[in-house]
């Protein structure tokens, strides 16, 4: 059952198209008089207890099936070659089936910066087992309540999640990242997570892979909930009061380096990509995808140069305009 579900997730993730993307409602103000040479632009950033050379990473997607194994190997090769973080999909399938090797990418990619993922429904003992078996540089702990509720076989008991989060924060020996799955993390959740000791979150807003859409495609029910949650940029705007206390990672509908820059302008430490990279490895050879991802680094530098930003931190000084739904919501927030 798990294998079929994981393959369905891949299939439906690739087929869905979003008519709205909140990044399109942000315009950055160009600077006509440059201050820096292109080779002075520094893309490095810091989060989860370490310095990273580049402010983007391949976010959690898949595992738990033969198709998932194939995709994870491709993604690991891309990430290792490009020197970026790669986070596997939820390790729960391997916890249920010890023979599942679809997450085992480190042996063939020894220099890979590897993260892995587990659901908050799992007690900390399983999180510790995951870390022991995968040896990741960080552990994403995902919260996916709407997805669980829409899954016929999904979780129905949630009272333990907060105590689990407290346990993860205290006992997991590597940095943890509390991660949404495309519904947009709200500010109250960030506040509660902070009280439990969490210092890094992935807001993961609506606009990319929708697990509401995926589960409704599987069950044929409740498609009126396909657009549930906050868009990625809206979630990031909502989290502004927390950006000096909590490291904000952003994912959900990120398509290109310009979208990445817009996230960084609003205080993100780094940006995760899932479906964009999945589409690439399913369309092109691994070598071609490596070339595309390396090109993103060059594009980030040239955009930063045109905005007079030598560092990622400088981007938070960039002026911008908001339009449409994003402007309306932001105006409401200012009045509240």
Curated annotation (Swiss-Prot):
Positions that bind FMN? 60-62, 90, 117, 179, 204, 209, 253-255, 274-275
State where Mg(2+) binds: 148
Q: Which reaction does it catalyse?
A: isopentenyl diphosphate = dimethylallyl diphosphate
**A biological process term (GO) from this entry:** isoprenoid biosynthetic process
Task: Return the Gene3D superfamilies for the record.
Answer: Aldolase class I
Q: Binding of substrate: at which residues?
A: 5-6, 147
The source's domain of life comes to: Bacteria
Query: Can you supply one Gene Ontology CC term for this chain's record?
Result: cytoplasm
Question: What's one Pfam family here?
Answer: FMN_dh
Q: List where in the cell it is found.
A: Cytoplasm
**Keyword Isomerase attached:** yes
**Sorted alphabetically, which CDD domains does this protein's record hold?**
IDI-2_FMN
Family the entry assigns: Belongs to the IPP isomerase type 2 family.
- What protein name applies here? Isopentenyl-diphosphate delta-isomerase
Query: Source species, please?
Result: Streptococcus pneumoniae (strain 70585)
